[in-house]
A protein has these predicted regions:
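Extracellular/periplasmic carbohydrate-active domains that bind, remodel
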Residues: 1-300
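Low-complexity, Ser/Thr/Pro/Gly-enriched N-terminal "stalk/linker" regions
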Residues: 301-357
Length: 357
């Protein structure tokens, strides 16, 4: 009865129940008073555990959930093993542990209409009230196909998240948008730290291999001023054959709350738009042996020449003692050489000027 059907979601959105529910949460209305039921357009999860321990979900196939597929909430000691999720409906997340600890997700296949795995810890006031981070989570030997993200933190992450380890996974689809994704905003707040991914093989993804976004849903109606922090995130030994971006980081505008981000020993080919793009306030974003489209990505401080004028000056001073005279030489030989040299330097400047490598 509740399975996803094309077009039904849009009809339910017109009822306004979701907006009313979110307003109740923002205003601190007690849980027991947030009552909705049949005919009001809110979709349930397929599997939902609340305040439970020692949970095992094993060797089952779940299809066409109306909302999130597996959603343990405030639980401990969870194993999801050998599960296949096929759910192309909206908000069709595969597995969303929320405010949970000690979680193992392994040997699973995800084909979803939203995030494959999305780790959460409460939305805005609710998450701050619980104050229970999701922590100690291992994701391994999984395959991610369609979805908004392979391994995702957020966006309902107000209680924080720490100690997430994803390894030995395969991801590939023109409809898989990101590989490792962190999404939050200043409605949420919370501390996200110690997020690590290694040994992941990617055929293609639609947007970015690594995306950190601190300005997710900027038009959300909420009380703001709760600046989140994202720190100690690493990606190592990850390969990708096609994407629009390699690394895409959107930091905050007010505080330097994205820092200690490390991409190491990774190789991204077929990057169409931009190898790396970092905006907003960030600190210590490091690339170590990151190869994108066959070129080594240098950290800004490691580049031998920071500006076009620095390169030009150094080049000419090395070549002749009175290099300034070359600019005014009337000899055809030197005019020709300077023209080639200036053109090459200009091309290099245009390539590097926005921080590209």
């Amino acid at each position: 009865h509740f399975g996803y059907k094309e077009g039904v979601t849009k009809e339910h959105q017109k009822m306004g129940s979701r907006a009313r529910l979110q307003k109740m949460a923002e205003d601190g209305v007690p849980f027991d008073e947030r009552k909705f039921g049949m005919g009001q357009g809110l979709r349930p999860q397929l599997v939902n555990f609340v305040r439970s321990e020692r949970i095992l979900i094993k060797d089952v196939k779940m299809i066409n959930s109306p909302f999130w597929v597996m959603h343990p909430l405030l639980c401990k000691d969870i194993t999801v093993d050998g599960v296949t999720v096929w759910n192309e409906g909206p908000n069709g997340d595969g597995c969303d542990p929320e405010a949970c600890e000690n979680v193992l997700i392994q040997n699973c296949i995800f084909h979803t209409g939203d995030d494959c795995i999305a780790i959460k810890s409460g939305r805005n006031n609710d998450g701050r009230l619980w104050n229970q981070p999701s922590k100690n989570i291992i994701i391994r030997n999984c395959r991610m196909e369609d979805g908004h993200g392979g391994v995702v933190i957020g966006s309902e992450i107000s209680g924080g998240c720490e100690n997430v380890y994803a390894e030995n996974c395969e991801m590939d689809s023109p409809h898989l948008e990101r590989i490792l994704r962190i999404k939050t905003n200043n409605c949420r707040g919370g501390l996200i730290q110690n997020i690590h991914m290694r040994k992941v093989t990617v055929g293609q993804c639609k947007e970015a291999v690594l995306k950190i976004n601190l300005d997710y849903e900027p038009r959300e109606a909420c009380y703001r001023g709760f600046e989140p922090t994202v720190r100690n995130v690493s990606m190592e030994d990850v390969t990708c054959q096609k994407s629009n971006y390699g690394v895409l980081i959107i930091g905050g505008n007010k505080v330097e709350n994205v820092y200690d981000i490390h991409v190491k020993n990774c190789k991204f080919d077929g990057v169409i738009k931009q190898p790396t793009k970092v905006t907003g306030k960030t600190r210590n974003v490091k690339f170590d042996n990151l190869i994108i489209n066959g070129s080594l990505v240098l950290n800004k401080e490691d580049r031998p020449y920071q500006t076009y004028s620095e390169w030009l000056t150094h080049s000419e001073m090395q070549r002749v003692p009175q290099s300034y005279l070359l600019d005014f030489s009337k000899k055809p030989k030197w005019s020709y050489v300077m023209g080639i040299e200036m053109e090459g330097m200009l091309d290099t400047y245009l390539h590097y000027k926005d921080g590209k490598s």
